[in-house]
Design a protein with these regions (language model features):
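Acidic, metal-coordinating catalytic segment for phosphate/diphosphate chemistry
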Residues: 84-134
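Hydrophobic alpha-helical positions that pack around
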Residues: 159, 173, 177
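N-terminal strand-loop-strand
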Residues: 13, 112-158, 162, 184-185, ...
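Active-site-adjacent beta-strand/loop module that shapes the phosphate/pyrophosphate-binding cleft
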Residues: 194-219
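Nudix hydrolase/Nudix homology domain
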Residues: 1-98, 152-156, 218-260
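Surface-exposed, charge/polar-rich loops and edge strands
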Residues: 167
């Protein structure tokens, strides 16, 4: 069976809530069925209170359906469901970005559940991930935390950036730190990775050690930053740490540093 998850016209994920927990509603179709990127409004109806009413027997009666941004579902769904929903969103986004062949302009068709083919020139394509690095820079018992101008909330994160063509991951780490802060680093070491479906990325985390330099925000991407100790992190107005949410690679790196 093929499994489909549902996003509405605002790119929000459809969730069940049975009064106890949130789960993912889905459509299960035979393997021979042709692939289609369903939207929620094709299979359910919206009612006045912002909830959805099921029009298919696949959705059990008595369950409330809610639409929610994918990022907001991290703390509500199981890790496995969150990852499945992220993959579904990445494929939906990618399908919208590859409606026509890049070589001849012909409308693309689905070849498999994860590839598209041009019926005119027979070219087949697969999703291309946008690979990014993120790094926690150590200076003794301190770590470099920065605030980007693009952050929607008031928190400090880590230096991050996209890998360029012809560049290794380690070269990207070194370049991004220098471009954004004017600092030199060494001892770059891999920490971990995670899918990052915002919209089609792979985030790869590293630790590194400070060598030299004074912090200067040269490229204009950062608004603030500095080296902080675990017991002296930047805080919000309510006294809570102003650091990224637990779903992010940045928080995993920060937690690893604080626990180490």
């Amino acid at each position: 069976m093929k499994r489909y998850y549902l996003f509405d016209e605002h790119d929000e994920l459809l969730l069940y809530h049975d009064g106890k927990e949130y789960t993912l509603p889905r459509l299960d179709l035979p393997d021979e069925a042709s692939f289609h990127a369903f939207s929620a409004d094709e299979v359910v109806g919206r009612v006045s209170n912002g909830k959805f009413r099921s029009s298919l027997p696949a959705f059990p009666e008595g369950h409330d359906l809610f639409a929610m941004p994918l990022r907001a579902t991290y703390r509500l769904l199981s890790p496995a469901d969150y990852q499945r929903a992220g993959k579904a969103w990445e494929l939906l986004y990618w399908s919208e970005q590859t409606a026509y062949c890049g070589r001849c302009g012909t409308a693309m068709q689905w070849a498999t559940a994860i590839s598209r083919r041009c019926p005119q020139c027979d070219g087949e394509i697969w999703p291309q991930l946008n690979t990014a690095i993120i790094v926690l820079v150590h200076k003794g018992d301190e770590a470099l935390l920065v605030k980007a101008k693009t952050f929607h909330r008031n928190f400090f994160g880590l230096v991050a950036g996209f890998v360029e063509t012809g560049e290794s991951l380690e070269e990207c780490v070194e370049r991004e730190v220098f471009e954004e802060t004017s600092l030199r680093i060494t001892n770059i070491r891999y920490f971990g990775s995670q899918p990052w479906p915002y919209p089609l990325g792979l985030m790869i985390g590293f630790h590194a050690d400070y060598v030299s330099g004074d912090i200067r925000f040269a490229d204009g991407e950062l608004a603030d930053g500095g080296f902080f100790r675990p017991d002296d992190l930047p805080t919000n107005a309510d006294g809570s740490p102003a650091i990224p949410g637990t779903e992010s690679m940045a928080r995993r790196l920060i937690n690893d540093w604080m626990e180490g």
